Curated annotation (Swiss-Prot):
GO terms for cellular component: proton-transporting two-sector ATPase complex, catalytic domain. Belongs to the V-ATPase E subunit family. InterPro entries: ATPase_E_C, ATPase_V1_Esu. The keyword Transport applies. GO terms for molecular function: proton-transporting ATPase activity, rotational mechanism. It holds the Pfam family vATP-synt_E. Keywords: Hydrogen ion transport, Ion transport, Transport. This is V-type proton ATPase subunit E. PANTHER family: ATPASE H+-TRANSPORTING V1 SUBUNIT E1A-RELATED. V-ATPase is a heteromultimeric enzyme made up of two complexes: the ATP-hydrolytic V1 complex and the proton translocation V0 complex. The V1 complex consists of three catalytic AB heterodimers that form a heterohexamer, three peripheral stalks each consisting of EG heterodimers, one central rotor including subunits D and F, and the regulatory subunits C and H. The proton translocation complex V0 consists of the proton transport subunit a, a ring of proteolipid subunits c9c'', rotary subunit d, subunits e and f, and the accessory subunits vah-19/Ac45 and vah-20/PRR. Subunit of the V1 complex of vacuolar(H+)-ATPase (V-ATPase), a multisubunit enzyme composed of a peripheral complex (V1) that hydrolyzes ATP and a membrane integral complex (V0) that translocates protons. V-ATPase is responsible for acidifying and maintaining the pH of intracellular compartments and in some cell types, is targeted to the plasma membrane, where it is responsible for acidifying the extracellular environment.
């Protein structure tokens, strides 16, 4: 018995429905997989962008904190420098006051000859040259001439050699000088300043740390002390 046209049409419709269902299921499967992959990639992209944003703000936060530290350090340094300058200015004022009082020493005609002798001896012993040119204030010239022989004898007794000292009566120390002498040897190549100002500067270099401590207290940053 042959298959009727109706049966053939029915089988064809059944086959087409099956194929269509398979195609729809496959399309849905492909869509689902594509959506899953899209969501995964989208998640990765979102996470990557979130990480970049976090890194950006972390970097900015570190930069801001660094700037704060730099500003704080600069302010501390400026404050420290101002404090140090104020201290140095005060110390300079103390030394300037001492320097201004030097003239009172040479004005004391009872004490000054002994002080002048000490300055002259210090200069001669520091120099220890056989030929020396001596410069002093013009108003001290007579006093220097009086005490010089005694100083030369003392140098000779100690050194064993005699110094020939010529008082320079053409070139004098400045009238503004507080007093003392200046000694030259080897045609001026060697020069020793034994003036009151020079001695004050020498003493100031040695005692400045002690003066700072007396005025401002010990330095908290200093680990070792003399």
């Amino acid at each position: 018995m042959g298959i009727s046209d109706n049966d053939v049409q029915k089988q064809l419709r059944h086959m087409m429905a099956f194929i269509e269902q398979e195609a729809n299921e496959k399309a849905e499967e492909i869509d689902a997989k594509a959506e899953e992959e899209f969501n995964i990639e989208k998640g990765k992209l979102v996470q990557l962008q979130r990480q970049k944003i976090m890194e950006y703000y972390e970097k900015k936060e570190k930069q801001v904190e660094l700037q704060r530290k730099i500003q704080r350090s600069n302010m501390q340094n400026q404050s420290r420098l101002k404090c140090l300058k104020a201290r140095d200015d005060h110390l300079k004022n103390v030394l300037e006051e001492a320097r201004a009082n030097l003239s009172k020493i040479s004005a004391d005609r009872e004490r000054y000859p002994a002080i002048l002798k000490g300055l002259l001896l210090q200069g001669l012993f520091q120099l220890l040259e056989s030929k020396v040119v001596l410069r002093c204030r013009k108003k001290d010239e007579e006093m220097v001439a009086r005490i010089l022989p005694e100083c030369l004898e003392e140098v000779q007794r100690t050194w064993g050699n005699r110094s020939e000292v010529k008082i320079d009566n053409e070139h004098f120390l400045s009238p503004e000088s507080a007093g003392g002498v200046e000694l030259l040897a080897k045609d001026g190549k060697i020069r020793v300043s034994s003036t009151l100002e020079a001695r004050l500067d020498l003493i100031a270099d040695k005692i400045t740390p002690q003066v700072r401590t007396a005025l401002f207290g010990p330095n908290q940053n200093r680990r070792f002390f003399d």
